[in-house]
């Protein structure tokens, strides 16, 4: 029984729910757990390692039994829908959403395409218990979206996010990715511009722009087109042993700059500057658009509360062993020792 409780935690320790006032209503069951409504994804993004082929949905009758059990026996009142691709099957999604609402669940979805929703969908979701939707956008550059084969436009991103914000649905920190083949100073600036536009639309207070965005560097995952591209360039190993070593090293690292493999072709002095350029351009774009607007002080307090919650979550700040600092083109970066040795040996070759 004690082990089972590890799968649940109080809602006020989860950032997906504390931004919504409905979470604090009297009588609501306090525990949160994750569920799946579907498996797989309809997209074929070139950087994404697919956990399952195809796309399938969970049986609705079994889903209802499961939700009822969670409520009655585990005091659950909040659900995190952990699908890769929430909402692609519209008819099924509406039925599943109605089921969650039937059992008085507040819920959030952590993986949704901007092309999978309309404003009418968002209103339906909110009215049936949705508190938060996390979109996978990856870039503000149409060039890079096309390289990633995201199959949507930058305007689709704005349309979905602005609709969420306008009807009061929270959208957690957006994920931006740098370093795919074709990335450049120009495309990095385009991502920064979009980041600033979104922040200005929300009237996010100065200093919180970057807390609303995750900015990561591409890691080539085995089985993806970008991994095969890296192999063709000779960056992932010339032999089976070298490839095995690469996989061993990268199997448990995050998508951060310190682990980036430069299959882009840009000079490393430019590569290490991309993330800073994104933030600089985001600030410039934000300040320009906010000239005649007032910061949203209520939203500021909500983000402060959210940050306090994230600080309590042991998964947010994963500890790394054997950290040291090395200098890469003038940028001091904290790097795991085996990764740093591999990085310096194989990729920092620029004169």
Model feature map: region roles:
Residues 1, 113, 267-269:
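Helix N-terminus capping/helix-initiation residues
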Residues 1-8, 219, 223:
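Glycine-rich beta-alpha loop elements in corrinoid/cobalamin-binding modules
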Residues 9-182, 193:
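Radical SAM [4Fe-4S] cluster-binding motif and immediate context
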Residues 20-21, 27, 225-351:
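Radical SAM enzyme core and accessory elements
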Residues 43, 91, 143, 147-148, ...:
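Flexible glycine/acidic-rich beta-alpha junction loops that bind and position SAM and/or redox cofactors
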Residues 76, 102, 150, 194-201, ...:
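Short, well-ordered loop/turn and helix-capping segments at boundaries between secondary-structure elements
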Residues 127-132, 194-215:
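Structural recognition of alpha->loop->beta junctions
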Residues 188-191:
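Short alpha-helix in the alpha/beta-hydrolase fold that links the catalytic acid
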């Amino acid at each position: 029984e004690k082990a089972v409780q590890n799968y649940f935690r109080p809602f006020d320790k989860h950032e997906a729910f504390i931004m919504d006032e409905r979470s604090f209503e009297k009588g609501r069951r306090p525990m949160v757990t994750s569920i799946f409504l579907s498996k797989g994804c309809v997209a074929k993004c070139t950087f994404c390692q697919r956990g399952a082929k195809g796309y399938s949905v969970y049986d609705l009758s079994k889903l209802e039994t499961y939700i009822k059990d969670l409520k009655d026996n585990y005091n659950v009142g909040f659900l995190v829908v952990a699908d890769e691709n929430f909402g692609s099957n519209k008819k099924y999604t509406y039925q599943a959403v109605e089921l969650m609402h039937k059992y008085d669940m507040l819920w959030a979805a952590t993986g949704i395409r901007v092309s999978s929703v309309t404003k009418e969908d968002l209103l339906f979701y909110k009215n049936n218990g949705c508190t938060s939707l996390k979109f996978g956008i990856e870039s503000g550059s149409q060039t890079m979206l096309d390289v990633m084969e995201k199959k949507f436009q930058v305007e689709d991103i704005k349309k979905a996010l602005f609709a969420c914000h306008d009807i009061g649905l929270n959208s957690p920190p957006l994920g931006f990715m740098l370093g795919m083949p074709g990335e450049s100073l120009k495309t990095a600036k385009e991502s920064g511009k979009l980041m600033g536009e979104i922040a200005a639309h929300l009237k996010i207070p100065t200093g919180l722009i970057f807390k609303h965005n995750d900015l990561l560097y591409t890691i080539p995952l085995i089985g993806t087109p970008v991994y095969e591209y890296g192999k063709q360039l000779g960056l992932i190993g010339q032999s089976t042993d070298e490839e095995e070593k690469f996989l061993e090293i990268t199997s448990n690292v995050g998508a951060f700059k310190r682990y980036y493999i430069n299959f882009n072709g840009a000079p490393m002095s430019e590569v290490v500057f991309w993330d800073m350029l994104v933030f600089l351009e985001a600030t410039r774009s934000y300040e320009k658009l906010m000239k005649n607007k007032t910061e949203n002080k209520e939203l500021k307090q909500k983000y402060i509360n959210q940050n306090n919650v994230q600080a309590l979550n042991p998964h947010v700040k994963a500890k790394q062993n054997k950290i040291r600092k090395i200098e890469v083109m003038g940028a001091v970066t904290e790097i795991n020792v085996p990764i740093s040795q591999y990085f310096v040996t194989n990729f920092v070759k620029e004169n």
